[in-house]
Amino acid sequence: MPNPERHGGKKDGSGGASGTLQPSSGGGSSNSRERHRLVSKHKRHKSKHSKDMGLVTPEAAPLGTIIKPLVEYDDISSDSDTFSDDMAFKLDRRENDERRGTDRSDRLHKHRHHQHRRSRDLLKTKQTEKEKNQEVSSKSGSMKDRISGSSKRSNEENEDYGKAQISKSSSNKESRSSKLHKEKTRKERELKSGHKDRSKSHRKRETPKSYKTVDSPKRRSRSPHRKWSDSPKQDDSPSGASYGQDYDLSPPRSHTSSNYDSYKKSPGSTSRRQSISPPYKEPSAYQSSTRSPSPYSRRQRSVSPYSRRRSSSYERSGSYSGRSPSPYGRRRSSSPFMSKRSLSRSPLPSRKSMKSRSRSPAYSRHSSSHSKKKRSGSRSRHSSISPVRLPLNSSLGAELSRKKKERAAAAAAAKMDGKESKGSPIFLPRKENSLVEAKDSGLESKKLTRGVKLEKSAPDTELVNIPHLNTEVKNSLDTGKVKLDENSEKHPIKDLKAQGSRDSKPIALKEEIVTPKETETSEKETPPPVPAVTSPPPPLPTTSPPPQTPPLPPLPPLPAIPQQPPLPPPQPAFSHVLASSTSTLPPSTHPRTSTLSSQANSQPLAQVSVKTQVSVTAAIPHLKTSTLPPLPLPPLLPGDDDMDSPKETPPSKPVKKEKEQRPRHLLTDLPLPPELPGGDPSPPDSPEPKAVTPPQQPYKKRPKICCPRYGERRQTESDWGKRCVDKFDIIGIIGEGTYGQVYKAKDKDTGELVALKKVRLDNEKEGFPITAIREIKILRQLIHRSVVNMKEIVTDKQDALDFKKDKGAFYLVFEYMDHDLMGLLESGLVHFSEDHIKSFMKQLMEGLDYCHKKNFLHRDIKCSNILLNNSGQIKLADFGLARLYNSEESRPYTNKVITLWYRPPELLLGEERYTPAIDVWSCGCILGELFTKKPIFQANLELAQLELISRLCGSPCPAVWPDVIKLPYFNTMKPKKQYRRRLREEFSFIPSAALDLLDHMLTLDPSKRCTAEQTLQSDFLKDVELSKMDPPDLPHWQDCHELWSKKRRRQRQSGVVIEEPPPSKASRKETTSGTSAEPVKNSSPAPPQPASGKVEPGTGDAIGLGDITQQLNQSELAVLLNLLQSQTDLSIPQMAQLLNIHSNPEMQQQLEALNQSISALTEATSQQQDSEHMAPEESLKEAPPALVVQPSAEQTTSEASSTPADMQNMLAVLLSQLMKTQEPAGSLEENNSDKNSGPQGPRRTPTMPQEEAAACPPHILPPEKRPPEPPGPPPPPPPPPLIEGDLSSAPQELNPAVTAALLQLLSQPEAEPPGHLPHEHQALRPMEYSTRPHPNRTYGNTDGPETGFSATDTDERNSGPALTESLTQTLVKNRTFSGSVSHLGESSSYQGTGSVQFPGDQDLRFARVPLPLHSVVGQPFLKAEGSSNSVVHAETKLQNYGELGPGTTGASSSGAGLNWGGSAQSSAYGKLYRGPTRVPPRGGRGRGVPY
């Protein structure tokens, strides 16, 4: 039967353990009795060694029973118990060290040669005990049967090991076995009688069998497996495994803490543990386990208090498992623990001690969790679990560093031990369990089983057992062959694994961040235990143990044991056990990791913990029983860990120990988690691990807040948290983070620029902000050229004592980056070429791919979190929302992450089990934004955001996204109508390779969306060579950050001209805006292209005016709105009449020419002229807006080509006329026109300037209009007086800044217009999007037209549908929507992002749009004619209503207003206008639209 086979594999360990554990089955009682007799013989031999190990009193049994429940709770609360457990572990380790000292030589030789004999003696003793136990209950009988099978095998293995081991184990174990067995039989009878009836008892019985199998060499190799797949391996008792798990997990905690304390407190408790190991012969069992059988005795027991502690732990756990008085005893260890106990007791007293350890709360926890994990298939999980365990036990940083050091030490020690022990004993000797290893197959398997039992039964036992388990695991790892030989050994190892997994689970909780590293460590460890991996599967144990058995002979090398003694007795034992479990665990664990994600986390911890875990487990179980005492252990733990690490071949094990030890340190040092790579801060025992002792420094300097990042050893010179913020000269504030401000500062020592991110603590209820902790832990693990580098942490206190006065603040010190992408796009100071966009995206996706491969989700990718320096280097920043991602884990995450504009549809629909695809969607939004200069999806509500996404990417439906129906909000957030995917049409203006990538990144179905790695292989990015890319021409005189951009936008809105910072910025925007404003008015009429063209000048005006309009009073805005509304009735002839153009046939011709020019894509100039025309029209009541629109388009063309003077004149005329029409609005316009008119001279009728401008550039307009324009807008005969009055009022109302901005706009557009025209033609192709790009983002618009264009863009996108009037209405809606967006900080131009804004979206803003505006939209022609200024004013008003906030929004609003006039035009114009807008980029000061 598989269990007996495993038992046989365990021979030594399983025989004794089975005697104790098997009592449950009646059939097995005879076999178990026979084996018990054998065990007793072995125990007699071992008793000599066992006596040295420590005397275990029968009391241990009762304690064990008490401890069992404790063990369960310990599993649950291993985190909190980690620290208190250390004390108990120290004691155990000391005992173990003592035992090691006495038993090292014996164990080494006996371990290899006499382990079989020992196991036989132990088996005999345990069989005797088993018989007694069987008498107690049928459960005990069944367990004994399992034990007997294991004892038989263990006897065989013992023979292989050597008679020396047998003699030791038998002598010691017999004495202990007799006592313990008697007590155990009594307890087991009591407990098992209750358990027998339950199915749990059967499961446990089966579990004991599996444990027995594991106890032997098999167990060792398997014990890692066993931890997770005890029951699976024990095919006989899946339920048994689950029982062990269940019990381990809950009750043992409470019991563990109390029992563990008692163990710690009294030597009697240690003796109890010992007695527990053998059923009731604790002394013999303890001695044997201490000397040879238990990895503890070899590795950590040598003379370490561990041996005593563990013996007490064994006693408790033995009493627990034997008597099973407590429900935990029944569930967990009645049958499984009994088998474990009997196995470990009868084969080797040392295993008993291990058992007691396993019984100890921590240990039992481990065993139960392991068995559960085994059941679930935690083999794959194991690797994950061990890393997780480490984090749970201690602070992530400390444990990680410790683990690293210990791993290194373990690797070195493993080599040394391997040489000494010929490979197999390497691990055991390291853990001072080499003697135990000699008895290893039988004793260790028994111990492991016992350890598992004890873990379940009592935390204290767990502590003791963990060392044994670790040693066994290490033995199995070191002696992969030995493990194969000894199936029983593997099973014990598995038990250890189970225990380790329990420990690791809590650790995992603690050190979530450390988990990745720990997982790596566990993976590293996993390779050494490959033989164990073979043995881990339930069937494998039988098969694989034989291969491992041959290595057992090498186990004897005594030198390994001597190494162990240096380890601090308490911690070494524990760490050794952990190490063993880790070593064994890795093979099985890795397979299990996939199966059990959470368990996998714990198991990797166990593996990593193998070194650290010993301390961790010791710390955890002890913590459970007595939290305070274990705290002192951490210092010892490091040494022990180091010792363990040298003994343990797998370097990851030492890391675990380091982690275990460091946990306490970690409590003091938050940043320590990244230290994981560093190694144990205090590894005195392991000089080799010390080699990796950056953590040592933290130990030396405990006040350290942060340890250097793994790759930053050099920076250890100035320890994190050691410096004060006064070492920096703060230059200014550059941002506002989630938990404080961000400052630009200069290091006084080095002179380098840094960014200081302030973490304020005064308002923190929880102490240090969790987001800051998470960011620190994650950033210390991410070292990449495209990820921002955190240099150190400083405080605002000179002395640590100052924190008593007030909490103060911490500062995270980052490398300084000159700009962020949002600030640059919104500034309008930069125009990115296709190559620049390629470079940015390549760097961004490389950084994201790195994060995803490290299993981190960023969860907040947006333009303001993408930093650039002046050399064009991009870095991903702000990891405050980032978190570790486990693909095997099914736990939900919050979906309230990622800024709304960049949030993917699955999060909007309520997905909580998302993948890294969420970050790819955000990067796709940024790719579109780089081309369009504005966010492509700008909504202020989740429903509106989903609507925008649906309009561009199609509605989410099962046809394209099969799993969408499973999402919580799929039915509640369905769009009002179904949309088809229009992304390729909307973005047809971008290169095809970029379009393909954008299409793939913005796929609705996250499972079909490309990964970050795939984006790097796309045609757009695969051939990009960053080294050959020319850096973009970034503004070196101005750092463009989000905060600066927002301030600038607010100033623009408030009317304060921000020309000074970069005058070029203001002038560019203004110029462009002026141009766009006029075209917008034109666009309002029928021709969409002219609308766009007009939008550009109008927007420019709006922006030039934009600043003015921002400055306009509400009354002025209202006047503008009224004018625009009244203009709806205007026709082209009416407009001409109003403008006095009707009298001139040339004007009519010009109007026709304007229409042609509109067709010719001369939107920019025509828009400007139109706005001029509109001004006169407005003064004339804007009756002929339609006419004006066409002429203005024509004029716009001419104006674009016309000289800057013409542009200025036209703008001035438009402004003056607008002012005339409405004195409030007119006053603003007057101011502009005055400034413009100064150069222009007389303000002729706007018609004249328009005609001139149109005629000059296109040469279509009659020269009449053109000449008046350059000198100044000649006032039309009727309008001039009005214009003058308006102008006079306007200058008064307008700020000088506004006038200056207008002038700049005029001058700049002049230069820009020619370029605009060609661009316009190009833009025509993309139409909506092309228009959109310029106005796309307020900050995105490089040129003024774009700024003004944002509103237009919105309109144009609507016009994309090509509905002129509906477009105008939608434009109004968009406008309103954009206004609301600007509230959000988006620019209306942002909203303008053409296709993004749809009627539904507009509805949101629509409410905000004044009715007049709507009417204006209804009357696009009037608007167009109504003078761009009035339109701009009206739009500005709208945006103000919408609280566009940014001045750019106002400007863009005006531009949009024009667009409203001609939505249909807007689409045509959009294309036209788009080109010019791009040229205007310099002027495209982003129209100050709110981001």
UniProtKB/Swiss-Prot annotation:
One of its GO terms (cellular component) is nuclear speck. The modification Phosphotyrosine is found at Y73. One of its GO terms (molecular function) is RNA polymerase II CTD heptapeptide repeat kinase activity. The modification Phosphothreonine is found at T57, T515, T693, T894, T1245, T1247. Residues 34-49, 107-119, 197-206, 367-382 have a biased composition (Basic residues). PROSITE patterns: PROTEIN_KINASE_ATP, PROTEIN_KINASE_DOM, PROTEIN_KINASE_ST. There is a cross-link at K264, K510, K656 (Glycyl lysine isopeptide (Lys-Gly) (interchain with G-Cter in SUMO2)). Cyclin-dependent kinase that phosphorylates the C-terminal domain (CTD) of the large subunit of RNA polymerase II (POLR2A), thereby acting as a key regulator of transcription elongation. Regulates the expression of genes involved in DNA repair and is required for the maintenance of genomic stability. Preferentially phosphorylates 'Ser-5' in CTD repeats that are already phosphorylated at 'Ser-7', but can also phosphorylate 'Ser-2'. Required for RNA splicing, possibly by phosphorylating SRSF1/SF2. ATP binds at residues 734-742, 757, 815-820, 1041. It comes from the Eukaryota. SMART domains: S_TKc. CDD domains: STKc_CDK12. Residues 1-13, 87-106, 120-134, 142-162, 185-196, 227-236, 429-459, 480-526, 655-667, 1170-1181 have a biased composition (Basic and acidic residues). The modification Phosphoserine is found at residues 237, 250, 266, 275, 277, 302, 304, 311, 313, 319, 324, 326, 333-335, 339, 342, 344, 346, 384, 386, 401, 421, 424, 615, 645, 682, 686, 890, 1054, 1084. This is Cyclin-dependent kinase 12. SUPFAM superfamilies: Protein kinase-like (PK-like) (SSF56112). Keywords: ATP-binding, Isopeptide bond, Kinase, mRNA processing, mRNA splicing, Nucleotide-binding, Nucleus, Phosphoprotein, Serine/threonine-protein kinase, Transferase, Ubl conjugation. It comes from Ailuropoda melanoleuca. Residues 1-704, 1051-1105, 1162-1204, 1221-1371, 1469-1491 are annotated as: Disordered. Its main location: nucleus. It holds the Pfam family Pkinase. Residues 527-572, 671-686, 1269-1282 have a biased composition (Pro residues). The active site is at D860.
